[in-house]
Amino acid sequence: MSPTGFTRAAAAPPPTLSRHAADTARLAAPLAIAQLSQMAMSVTDTVLLGSLGPDALAAGGLGANLSFVVVTLLQGVLTSVSVSVAHARGAMAEDRVPHIYWTGFALSLLLAVPAFALLSFAQPLLLAFGEPAALARNVGEYAAVLRFAAPGSLIGVGLMRSFLPAIGAAKRLLWVSLAGVGVNAFLNYGLIHGAFGLPRLGFLGSATATTITIWLTAITLVALLHGRSTFRHFVAATRPRLPLMGELFGIGWPVAITYGVESTLFLATGLTVGVLGESSLAAHQIALNVASVAFMVPLAIGQAANVRVGYWAGAGAPVAARHAGFVALGLGVAFMSLSGLVLIVAPHAIVGLYLKLDDPANARTVVLATSLLGIAAVFQIVDGMQTVGSGCLRGLKDTRVPMLAAMLGYWGIGFPTGYWFAFHAGLGARGLWWGLAAGLASVAMLMTWRFHRKSAALGVRADARGQA
């Protein structure tokens, strides 16, 4: 293994399946913990905002969600950085890596402009959708603070989460993300309540704390990357290249659209569940929260697959690229199967983390939530499969067809099926969740089939070149 965690294609034979599994797990583990740390920051914000009352929680929560959606969609464009670096390293063309890094850095700053603009108009946008004036004003104030975090988020999360794993430096994400949870909690409490000698800013203190934490995270990651001699040659000073920026954007924009298609599916499902009543919505939120936590692991495996498939594809080793992808798919399905088994075996224990099971007022929600967790056990397996499959295809720089597959699966199959089950078959929230499962299953099958075809074709082309 090289110091950065990749077997050099020119120096060693392609790895065995067990080595693929070990290397993928080693790369995915810090990414999963970093993503769980980001979720922990969100939970911290929610808990501390809740101490100010429901109005502050509603405004802060909506403002944070709005910011998260906008920035996450734009971060999708930057996923192109990881696969481009992986291809360059696999092809033993590491002199290209600094050009990719600095072009990606410039692209991050450019993407921050629409993020800043959208968050600046949060209040009029909410008013246009008929939200109450007081809520729209408070959300607008919250988003106006968070907009200043957009450049830091696109650099610290978008760029660094793509670049660092591709050069074998994923562990830096882990430690900095864990530290960020503590810093965010300290600043949130201090700025909300005026503790520790900090000014008391009320609910805007949470937005200020999050903004500061995001910038500290970005600055720390950049400093660690540039200051470590092992990685300094990857970031040697060079000018961004416009043609390369076009290439990165061309690979990345379909990923951003895919993120948007998936996000709107879950948003629409949540709004539709809300029509069925408070108990249904509460049960839906519990099941979705549990599924979201488990999803961080296959999401990280998909990011690792992106890098490893890209590396071996760049190295001209199509069999190794294919094996890297299918091993990652196996790991994702295996983890989500175990996670699903937990949901089947102990649904009441899980729901008990959110609600008092012996409270009669919660009885209907508890029954429905445990039922949804049973569906989530199936839902999780195909959800993990589709996100890892998407990562494998990104490793082959194949993003446009997966985008179309997501559109078809989520909105052509998933939501219509769920709506029919919910309101015509009388299954209610359970029907909507079966629709989600159907949509995710169709996308998972399409992604896996596409990777099978693309990776096999890559091998055929390599054989043809060898014979020529």
From Swiss-Prot:
Family matches, as Pfam families: MatE
Biological process (GO), any one: monoatomic ion transport
Keywords on record: Antiport, Cell inner membrane, Cell membrane, Ion transport, Membrane, Transmembrane, Transmembrane helix, Transport
Disulfide topology: none
Molecular function as annotated in GO: antiporter activity; xenobiotic transmembrane transporter activity
GO cellular component, one term: plasma membrane
Residue spans crossing the bilayer: 57-79, 100-122, 142-164, 173-195, 205-227, 248-270, 280-302, 323-345, 360-382, 401-423, 433-452
Membrane topology: Multi-pass membrane protein
Compartments, as annotated in UniProt: Cell inner membrane
Signal peptide bounds: none
Function field: Multidrug efflux pump.
NCBIfam families: matE (TIGR00797)
Family to which the UniProt record says this protein belongs: Belongs to the multi antimicrobial extrusion (MATE) (TC 2.A.66.1) family.
Protein name per UniProt: Probable multidrug resistance protein NorM
Originating species: Burkholderia pseudomallei (strain K96243)
